[in-house]
Curated annotation (Swiss-Prot):
Residues 223-275 are annotated as: Disordered. Coiled coil: none annotated. Belongs to the universal ribosomal protein uL2 family. It holds the Pfam family Ribosomal_L2_C. Part of the 50S ribosomal subunit. Forms a bridge to the 30S subunit in the 70S ribosome. GO terms for biological process: cytoplasmic translation. One of its GO terms (cellular component) is large ribosomal subunit. This is Large ribosomal subunit protein uL2. One of the primary rRNA binding proteins. Required for association of the 30S and 50S subunits to form the 70S ribosome, for tRNA binding and peptide bond formation. It has been suggested to have peptidyltransferase activity; this is somewhat controversial. Makes several contacts with the 16S rRNA in the 70S ribosome. SMART domains: Ribosomal_L2 (SM01383), Ribosomal_L2_C (SM01382). It comes from Shewanella loihica (strain ATCC BAA-1088 / PV-4). The keyword rRNA-binding applies. Keywords: Ribonucleoprotein, Ribosomal protein, RNA-binding, rRNA-binding.
């Protein structure tokens, strides 16, 4: 995988930094694992904007990724690695011994031809998925479930991982990249190793148009708006907003805690590190 800084042949190329992976499949994705992906433009069923800065972008197919890894005891071979426009990580097309194909997240170091497996009898190596009760303490894992059988929810982005730091009774304690320490049932599954494509963080799009290709619309500052649109809006000439930074709905936006799910507080051993 190479990080390439483009030559400044134009204003739009001057700041572009690309991540090029020659191992990725250059053809079309596997048609049997594609689904339609309709664009919402950030609107809900009433037509109102519920998510700002969303709209446009290149048409995409959704790749159906296996986050449950519940095909136990059947070895699988990695056929190829592919780009996925719906996530920062790359995905791997795997062929099971019984003929079924599935997409999974590509782990760091995974290559075409590798053998992987799921289940309690799987070997302790990158790409294999096991319940947390069968994973040694101190191991680095990704794609971790929060509820048994629900599918992976933690550590799915490019370059992310979680460390298993303890196991006590029915729960395993995980250290997340944010510094948070969290308990998860030991029957939840996780995949060994880190998520691949860690160089994704070095990428620079270089121009506004590249954001638009990805369906991201411009972000307008509150101080540039009118009073009807934002608490920072209005004033004669340029102003600083006149109050502590808030969202368009008046909620403080710099370090203000908004977590309100008290039901799951008991699973958080330590909150994340302050930046």
């Amino acid at each position: 995988m190479a990080v390439i800084k483009c030559k400044p042949t134009s204003a739009g190329r001057r700041h572009v930094v690309k991540v090029v992976n020659s191992d990725l499949h250059k053809g079309k994705p596997f048609a049997g694992l594609l689904a339609k992906k309709a664009k919402s433009g950030g609107r809900n069923n009433t037509g109102r904007i519920t998510v700002r800065h969303v709209g446009g972008g290149h048409k995409q197919h959704y790749r159906i990724v296996d986050f449950k890894r519940n095909k136990d005891g059947i070895p699988a071979k990695v056929e190829r690695l592919e780009y996925d426009p719906n996530r920062t990580a790359n995905i791997a097309l795997v062929l099971y011994a019984d003929g079924e194909r599935r997409y999974i997240l590509a782990a760091k170091g995974m290559q075409a031809g590798d053998q992987i497996q799921s289940g309690i009898d799987a070997e302790i190596k990158a790409g294999n998925a096991l319940p947390l009760r069968n994973i040694p303490v101190g191991s680095v894992v990704h794609a971790v479930e929060m509820k048994p059988g629900k599918g992976a929810q933690i550590a799915r982005s490019a370059g992310t991982y979680v460390q298993v730091v303890a196991r006590d009774g029915a729960y395993a304690t995980l250290r997340l990249r944010s510094g948070e320490m969290r308990k998860v049932p030991v029957d939840c599954r996780a995949t060994l190793g880190e998520v691949g494509n860690a160089e994704h963080m070095l990428r620079q799009l270089g121009k506004a148009g590249a954001k638009r290709w990805r369906g991201v619309r411009p972000t307008v500052r509150g101080v540039a708006m009118n009073p009807v649109d934002h608490p920072h809006g209005g004033g004669e000439g340029r102003t600083s907003g006149g109050r502590h930074p808030v969202t368009p709905w008046g909620v403080p936006t710099k370090g203000y805690k908004t977590r309100s799910n008290k039901r799951t507080d008991k699973y958080i051993v330590r909150r994340r590190n302050k930046k």
